[in-house]
Each structure stands twice: as structure tokens, then as C-alpha cells.
Design a protein with these regions (language model features):
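Long, helix-rich interaction regions
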Residues: 153-161, 337-491
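Extracellular ligand-binding/catalytic regions of CAZymes and related secreted enzymes
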Residues: 26-27, 231-404
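Helical hinge/lid and interdomain linker segments adjacent to catalytic or ligand-binding clefts
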Residues: 30-139, 426
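Sec-dependent N-terminal signal peptides
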Residues: 9-18
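C-terminal segment of classical bacterial N-terminal signal peptides
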Residues: 18-24
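An acidic, glycine-rich "communication" segment
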Residues: 129-234
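Positively charged n-region of N-terminal signal peptides that target proteins for export
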Residues: 1-9
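Short, flexible loop/turn segments with low-complexity composition
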Residues: 15, 292-305, 463-468, 481-485
């Protein structure tokens, strides 16, 4: 008995010593780290100021920091550069952390707006993508973790505190501080007819970038994804927002299928203890989705979704016209001011900042002319202007009444009425529409087949085949707007 007591006492002392020293047991997980990006961003640097030697050194430093960080916390870690990666490698690991760009296996047609493909459509390995890697590597797959804005600052907000990434296995200090709500978020909320508090609790993920780091481009700005339609499929979850230059619901940490977006792009050594723990927990959590593919694929990153209809209605108001006129004038004044400073500094032989260098070479722009409300509406939507003119209430009523029957135009950026659906009076996100369309096919009405092929990916020849498919899959069917205004099966 005395021996057992001594063993327990020794164990308690050892645990205490480990806690004090900051050490902890490694989590049993195999991780492949794919590096290749630097702790400086060439996009943010002045033209001609990128030092290739310094950039290469920064890549090496960041990879070393990530490798050390991961090996300290996981039992099996392999670190490679993006140029050495092939998708087949991920199958040997529980999770792949993408922090660098591999060699594309297929080049996209830039003239058609296509991106390069880095991962095959069949890719089902668990992956955590750091910052804009979500957009770079996931765009060709239809990843919802798209590039809404490369403007994620250093605070997380709107965290789902009950989510596993905030609760282990690595302990997270969730102590928040009250911080001012970002001005862009307040503006968007007003456009949406919503209100936000002037301050909200935020969690520090990493120290802010200094003025010198921002000016030189020696910083890694994070990326947020579009919230519109993000949650309209069962393979997604929003875990946290972040302080940024977009709406309050922009996605800073989220998951789409097997692809986990960790928007904060700072080096692990710069992350706070909470930030590091959340990243580690995200890697552990992502491993649970190994073998899962994307179900709803967002192939058009800018597709309009109905959750932003309030903003569409706001855009048809005099207030919106005044706002745009004022914004255009303010922006022009800012450009002229920076350009004047840049010219003066150049004439004096002084060094220009990256912003000044950009605006110095910018071609002369025509003067800003305020648009009348009628001119603004006519340019925005000529067809609706012919019907409603400058009647604000008529536009609002139009969108309110017809929203259930709307779908994107061919470009995907404007909502238009689907005449076949409107004629039936059944919303396109109501599964009764498919039942009715099959009935129309049975009656010989061509609208039935048109509707079925417009809102599903199936191409059956007979009503009986359509009905059999619908009856089998009905319990698992869902409607996705971000995925193309389609009825899909959760499988």
C-alpha cells in the first residue's frame, strides 16, 4: 500500500513538473506538413522590392518553425516543400497541413477564369489549409473556403466556444477582451438591416503587425471566406469569425468536407498560446474527416445567395446611391493625395512605400461625377428600371415577393425569377417542386423535365425513373445555393 501511495505521489509531482515546465505528452497523430510560403508576402511588397534571397530565407525559417511546432506536439511528422508534394502522399498520414503550393497537375485556362488544379476531384484526405491556401488549392475542387478577403487581422470573434477545437486535447485559454467592432462589419450590418454592438469579445490569436512590417510586406495577412451559403450543405461548419475588412460573419475558421480552413496565417512562433492550441486542436479535429469528400461543390465563388437579399434591396435605395457617390469621391481623394505625396518624395529622391509606388504609376483617372438616383438604378439593372423607375418600395416588394422563385443569372451575380417555378407557386428550395415536376412529365408537359434538370444533376429519361430516384433518396436530400441552386443527396 505504502509503495502504491509513493507511486501516485511521484506521478502527481511529475505531472506538476510537466505543467510548470509547459511540457505535455504528444498526441498520437501522423501529420504531413507541406511548406513553401514565407513569413513575408510578395503581394504586399513594393514593385521591385522583393529580395529573392531574403524570400527564400523566410520560407526556410517558416518551414523550420512549423516543423518544430508540429514535432513537439504530434508523434509522427513529415515536412516537405510544396514542389515535392504529390496528392498520393497524403494517404499515408492522418492529416496534411498545407502551407505551401504544390506543382499543379493541370493548368487552368486563365482567359476563361479557370484556376490551376493542385488536388484531384477524388481527393478525400483530411487537410488543414493555412490562410489563402484554402483558395489556391481548393478552388478547382469547389471548396467553400474561398477568397472573400485577404484582410483577416489578429483577433478571432464569434467563436463557437463549445466546438472541439476550443476544448482539447490541447488546452485553450479562451480569455477574451472587449474590442471595437470593425467599421466594415458595422457598415455591412446596416446594409443588411441588422445592428451590431460597438464592441464585442475577441480572442487574440497573434500580436498585431507593426507599421514597419506592414509597410515592408514582412507580414502574413490571413484570409476569410464568404459566409453566403456556407452552411447550406451538411458537410460544412463555421467555427469562428475574425476581425477583418468584411462582414461580421466572414469565415475565419471553418470546415467543408475534408478541407479545414485555418484563416490565421501567422507563423506558429508568432501565435499566442491560445492561437497555437487552437491550430493544434484544428489539426486533430480535421483528422476525423479523413476519407470524406465534398458533397456540395461551390464552383462559382461569387455566386449570389438569397441570405444577402436584404443587401440587394438596400442597393435599390437612395441611401445606397448616396453612399456609393460619397465612397467614390473619398476614394478618389485618397488616390490623389497619395499620388501627390509619391511624386513629391520621388522628386526629392526619397524611398517610396509600397502603396506610394503603386499609386505613382497609376494612370490618370477621369474626375468623379455624382450619379443621380435614376442613372444609378438604370446602370445597375436596366430591365428592372424600365418597370419600377425610381420607386424604392417597388424594388423591395419585387424581391420580397419573388425571392422563393429566384435563381442566379448566367453569370451567377444577380438573382432573377425562374418563370417555370414561379408559375407553379412552389419555392425552388421546397422538395415538393420535384414531385410536381415529375407530375408535369407524366402529363407530357416539357416544363417538368426542364425543372428537374435545372435543379438536380440527374438526367433520367422517364418519369418513373425520376420518381424512383426521388423516393429512394428523399430523406437525405438537401438544397444548396452556394453549390449551384441544386437538390443534392447527402451521401
Amino acid at each position: 500500500i505504502k509503495s502504491n501511495v509513493m507511486k501516485k505521489l511521484f506521478s502527481l509531482i511529475l505531472v506538476g513538473m510537466l505543467a510548470v515546465s509547459g511540457l505535455s505528452a504528444k498526441v498520437k497523430l501522423s501529420v504531413l506538413y507541406v511548406g513553401g510560403t514565407a513569413n513575408m508576402d510578395p503581394i504586399l511588397m513594393s514593385p521591385g522590392s522583393v529580395d529573392s534571397v531574403a524570400l527564400a530565407a523566410s520560407v526556410k525559417e517558416r518551414m523550420a518553425h512549423f516543423t518544430k511546432f508540429l514535432k513537439k506536439n504530434f508523434t509522427n511528422v513529415k515536412s516537405i516543400e510544396g514542389k515535392d508534394y504529390t496528392p498520393e502522399m497524403s494517404a499515408a498520414y492522418d492529416v496534411t497541413v498545407f502551407d505551401g503550393r504544390p506543382v499543379p497537375f493541370m493548368k487552368g485556362d486563365r482567359m476563361r477564369g479557370e484556376r490551376d488544379s493542385y488536388l484531384p476531384e477524388s481527393f478525400d484526405c483530411a487537410a488543414v489549409m493555412i490562410g489563402h491556401m484554402s483558395e489556391e488549392l481548393g478552388r478547382s475542387l469547389g471548396n467553400k473556403n474561398d477568397w472573400y478577403c485577404l484582410c483577416l487581422d489578429n483577433y478571432a470573434l464569434g467563436m463557437k466556444n463549445e466546438h472541439p477545437v476550443f476544448n482539447g486535447p490541447f488546452k485553450v485559454d479562451m480569455t477574451t477582451e472587449m474590442r471595437p467592432t470593425a467599421a466594415p462589419a458595422l457598415e455591412v450590418a446596416e446594409m443588411m438591416g441588422e445592428s451590431l454592438p460597438k464592441e464585442m469579445p475577441m480572442l487574440l490569436m497573434h500580436p498585431n503587425w507593426t507599421e514597419e512590417e506592414n509597410a515592408s510586406g514582412n507580414c502574413r495577412i490571413g484570409m476569410v471566406s464568404r459566409p453566403g451559403g456556407y452552411l447550406d450543405s451538411p458537410d460544412t461548419e463555421v467555427i469562428s469569425g475574425g476581425l477583418c475588412g468584411k462582414s461580421i460573419d466572414a469565415v475565419a475558421i471553418g470546415r467543408h468536407g475534408n478541407l479545414f480552413h485555418f484563416g490565421f496565417a501567422a507563423d506558429p512562433e508568432r501565435l499566442t498560446p491560445a492561437g497555437r492550441a487552437i491550430l493544434l486542436n484544428s489539426i486533430v479535429y480535421a483528422s476525423e474527416f479523413n476519407g470524406q469528400k465534398l458533397i456540395a461543390r461551390k464552383m462559382n465563388e461569387g455566386i449570389v445567395t438569397r441570405d444577402h437579399l436584404p443587401m440587394t434591396k438596400w442597393a435599390c435605395t437612395r441611401k445606397a446611391n448616396d453612399y456609393i457617390n460619397e465612397t467614390n469621391l473619398t476614394f478618389r481623394q485618397m488616390i490623389d493625395s497619395v499620388h501627390a505625396v509619391a511624386v513629391e518624395k520621388k522628386n526629392k529622391g526619397e524611398e517610396l512605400s509600397r502603396f506610394e509606388a503603386i499609386y505613382l504609376d497609376m494612370p490618370q483617372m477621369p474626375p468623379v461625377v455624382k450619379k443621380s438616383f435614376g442613372q444609378y438604378l438604370k446602370e445597375r439593372n436596366p430591365k428592372l428600371y424600365e418597370v419600377f423607375g425610381t420607386d424604392e418600395a417597388a424594388y423591395a416588394d419585387y424581391y420580397e415577393k419573388n425571392a422563393p422563385y429566384m435563381r442566379p443569372d448566367l453569370r451567377g451575380y444577380e438573382l432573377v425569377i425562374d418563370p417555370e417555378v414561379q408559375a407553379l407557386g412552389i419555392p425552388n428550395n421546397d422538395i415538393r417542386l420535384l414531385d410536381k415536376a415529375i407530375e408535369l412529365m407524366e402529363q407530357g408537359n416539357p416544363d417538368g423535365k426542364t425543372i428537374l434538370e435545372r435543379y438536380t444533376l440527374k438526367r433520367f429519361a422517364t418519369p418513373a425513373e425520376w420518381r424512383n430516384w426521388l423516393n429512394i433518396h428523399r430523406p437525405r436530400m438537401f438544397f444548396t445555393e452556394a453549390g449551384g441552386y441544386l437538390w443534392l443527396v447527402n451521401e
